[in-house]
């Protein structure tokens, strides 16, 4: 999104506040409470409060302000960000061996996101609804049911899109951040001593005083930066400058004031640790605060759900996930999509997490939070510095210093969160592992299948020359053969000739290709090559944020002089029946998983929006 128009900059910045910062903006609901809840062996003590506040503030400065908003956000692919984009950029100028390692890192990072995203809506919404304990303690048994109701409504409206409701996100989140700042400032004025915690020496003192326990406590501190990946992933929607402007002018000051306000309250009233966020507010403001908190957490959850949809589409287009139905809910914004399968799988997972893992309180979810986030941070550091060295050609010693600085923060955070493994951290890690296995299985087995199908030695040019010299029976009209690779004879063409011994007067070999870019300009959309008097090759290129559409391809072909009409064209496609060959047991398991994924994948006619009555599928049996 361009920010050149200065008049639109405030609007874009406001929109960024509403979408990008929802997750990190709702962290004050639970972060300081989890830090000082007594689980690490110390209570609400002055040194502990100052130490945690200092750690939270400097973590926001170093990780968000410096690492992500100054360095990582520079690595964009035509303005787009995200862990898979970073993976793609990092592997452009490296050896095949290094590229394979970088791809694995990127896929692990993407898988971690899937694992962590199950926790985010649950902990955010529950933390907001838990304000009921302050307003009306007798309603605490309704926290879980109300959380499920709110999330059910949220997932149900996904199919309708969020274009209309989304217009309210920005003003609501701006109001939320102003409330954060106001509540915090009010408490700080009453106890300004808390501002001493801005001194990083309090963080150092915290480690020196509490030693090993302070290291483990980093697992709670990291809750303050959850959602940091959204700053990079949503870069394509808003641009770098509006995201930075929103952070430094609104989000960072508001978060800092609120955290320090909670700290000031705890120094004055240690018993407020049961819910320091809501106890910042005067009694008359509790119900309005509960309502705005619930709205803010719903918006944060919406941003996460949209992020899952976008990541899934990118993984599908890059060939790491099987094709699935993707519905565009807005004609104006390509990022407004809905994926039914992902939506309801995520919903089921979130409800299970709330009912089984939370045990009626969001604090139990905090124990499951952090491993995947910090793991992704480590991978982002490695991938982004690889881009700096290989793509930007920065000095290798300077890049090494940057990487060491990043890892000096990321690795302790990740290691500290490993302590959560048995108390809930296994959940996002397990979900992430499942997604990693699914993505690597689909990619590797798909490659094996295509290689097996293309093992025949027939030359496309030789076959076309032979058909032109000794043509089979020709019938009027146009036929299209979908070809996955250029210069390879489509299976459907061979089987049609073998069994039907007939061709149409005009034959088009169509290849739909995904380029390493989010978008492809219409000028470069279609390349047409006439291979013989009756054969044409058409290569249509799409970016990974675009959805291929054969009707659009035909329109472009018409502009280039190759007239095609959808309802007068026959599409021949091959349908592979797969048989597993002899393999070791572990590869056989992977093969069975691939067969399951392929059986449930979206069929090509639906994937490319081809009318079913124009499609002829020819079956073929392939051993893999």
Curated annotation (Swiss-Prot):
Keywords, alphabetical: Cell inner membrane, Cell membrane, Ion transport, Membrane, Potassium, Potassium transport, Symport, Transmembrane, Transmembrane helix, Transport
InterPro entries reported for this sequence: K+_transporter, K_trans_C, K_trans_N, Kup
GO cellular component: plasma membrane
Main location class: membrane
Domain of life where this protein originates: Bacteria
Residue stretches spanning the membrane: 9-29, 49-69, 103-123, 137-157, 165-185, 213-233, 247-267, 276-296, 337-357, 365-385, 398-418, 421-441
Membrane topology of this protein: Multi-pass membrane protein
Membrane as UniProt keyword: yes
Reactions catalysed, as given in the entry: K(+)(in) + H(+)(in) = K(+)(out) + H(+)(out)
Function: Responsible for the low-affinity transport of potassium into the cell. Likely operates as a K(+):H(+) symporter.
The protein's name: Low affinity potassium transport system protein Kup
Organism: Shigella dysenteriae serotype 1 (strain Sd197)
